[in-house]
Design a protein with these regions (language model features):
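C-terminal catalytic or substrate-handling cores of phosphate/nucleotide-
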Residues: 51-55
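A short acidic (Asp/Glu
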Residues: 2, 45-50, 116-120
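Non-catalytic, usually N-terminal nucleic-acid engagement modules in DNA/RNA processing proteins
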Residues: 1-39, 45-46
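A short beta-strand-to-loop transition that corresponds to the Sensor-1 phosphate-sensing loop
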Residues: 37-41, 109-112
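Extended two-metal-dependent nuclease catalytic cores across DNA- and RNA-processing enzymes
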Residues: 5-8, 31, 56-213
Length: 214
């Protein structure tokens, strides 16, 4: 068997799994509305200008076949795919939650970054599709916690030698950051907080326009 045939089978298998998962989501959540957000190729650019280390731990080598599979998944007409070159998928989901009124909005992702969207009241729940459970929504702002503690998945270090115990006291104004720590904290807040995207209103209009065509 040649390599081309194997690649074609891989693409077909990924597309089949993708379609099956979307159909399952619609059944499990009793809805015909599933919106899928994708990372734009240059979506993280402005964040990396603030924190160059942002997502520097993501290795894309050897994943060309996977990217081709995902490209074809995005082209499936029966799914509502949202992809904008200069925006990350997280930003797109935030915009979707701002744009959609009335309907109950449930974010389906294993990513804790979306806790902030529920905390802001823009979505009602966050469902982890891996554990198959709804995430408990903490009282403390996830933006503040991650800005101090960091986030290894995004290669963000946070404030040095500060952890969850410090955060609990910090939000009660029992402890404080020095000037150098404040600078680190504020940069992390800009990068982590989806509401801090300087282009969020531009994205909102793009999302609204696409929603009218669905």
């Amino acid at each position: 068997r040649n390599e081309l045939a194997t690649q074609e089978e891989t693409v077909e298998n990924v597309i089949s799994i993708f379609k099956t998962q979307i159909a399952k989501l619609k059944r499990d959540f009793f809805t015909d509305k599933v919106y899928i957000a994708w990372d734009g190729r240059n979506g993280s650019k402005w964040r990396k200008e603030i924190l160059p280390e942002y997502k520097a731990n993501r290795n894309k080598d050897g994943k060309e076949d996977l990217f081709e599979c995902l490209n074809q998944c995005r082209e499936l007409e029966e799914n509502s795919n949202f992809l904008f070159d200069t925006f990350e998928g997280d930003d797109v989901i935030y915009a979707l939650c701002r744009a959609i009124d009335n309907d109950e909005k449930i974010i389906i992702s294993a990513d804790k970054d979306f806790l902030q969207v529920v905390q802001e009241g823009l979505a009602s729940k966050l469902f982890n599709q891996i554990s198959k459970q709804y995430r408990e929504i903490p009282e403390i702002s996830s933006i503040i916690e991650k800005s101090i503690c960091g986030d290894s998945s995004d290669n963000l270090k946070g404030v040095k030698n500060k952890g969850p115990a410090f955060v609990k006291k910090f939000v009660k104004r029992q402890v404080f950051l020095n000037e150098q720590e404040k600078e680190v904290f504020e940069k992390h807040k800009l990068v982590i907080g989806l509401r801090n995207n300087p282009y969020k209103n531009e994205l909102l209009e793009l999302v609204k326009k696409q929603l009218t065509n669905i």
